[in-house]
A protein has these predicted regions:
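Structural recognition of the beta-strand scaffold that forms the well-ordered cores
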Residues: 14-16, 68-71, 96-99, 121-124, ...
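His/Asp/Glu-enriched short active-site or ligand-binding loop at hydrolase and phosphoryl-transfer sites
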Residues: 82-105, 125
């Protein structure tokens, strides 16, 4: 970085982006827009994303039902997503059975998962696309008691393209929120799941 900065006509401005929540992503979009002289474009993008977030929240609130959701970020060891992933589940109208918005990933014990009786399971291995994520499915389905879980019995266990929609804190995270909303509340949402983004387990 030092060598590169010496070759530039002006001293570069270094912007550190370390978002933790969805609101941080919107703030960072505006910060980058301001720093690059593209404030109007950045504000328009952030505003449009915020509109989509609010739409999901408002529609999800129409249902008194809050399904218990297990969001898995890894299978060996078993990890549940934290921070923005828990926030996404809650905005989409679910209750995260494990995970905490104030913490990062949480290591889980399989017996704890069985005891939690999740009604929706979202397998979204961090950084994996859908094809790679599917390779982790047998690790889950071979575990004792898998077939007894409510989510499995009701056909509500899914694998997601985490690389595109849940792992990276950028604009596509909002599409990830919309995907979760339809998976958690299919009676309220439709047309939210892009082709090739989700598979059944």
């Amino acid at each position: 970085m030092a060598e590169l900065s010496e070759k530039l006509p002006n001293e570069p401005q270094v912007i550190s982006l370390d978002p933790t929540y969805i609101g941080d992503v919107l703030d960072d979009i505006r910060r980058v827009g301001l720093a690059t002289g593209k404030s109007d474009e950045a504000d328009n993008l952030a505003d449009s994303l915020e509109t989509r977030i609010n739409a999901v929240r408002e529609i999800a609130l129409k249902s008194p039902d809050r399904p218990r959701v297990l969001q898995l970020e890894w299978t060996e060891p078993l990890l549940s997503g934290g921070h923005w992933v828990v926030e996404m589940v809650e905005l989409a109208g679910g209750i995260s059975v494990f995970g905490d918005k104030t913490q990062s990933s949480m290591r889980l014990d399989w017996d704890e998962i069985v005891a939690s009786q999740p009604e929706v399971i979202l397998l979204m291995p961090c950084g994996f696309d859908l094809d790679r994520a599917r390779e982790d499915i047998p690790t889950l389905t071979s575990l004792r008691g898998w077939e007894s879980l409510p989510a499995v019995q009701e056909g509500r266990a899914y694998v997601l393209d985490a690389s595109e929609y849940t792992s990276r804190l950028g604009p596509r995270l909002i599409t990830g929120l919309e995907i979760m909303a339809e998976l958690i509340h299919p009676e309220l949402f439709s047309g939210m799941v892009p082709e090739g983004s989700v598979g059944a387990i």
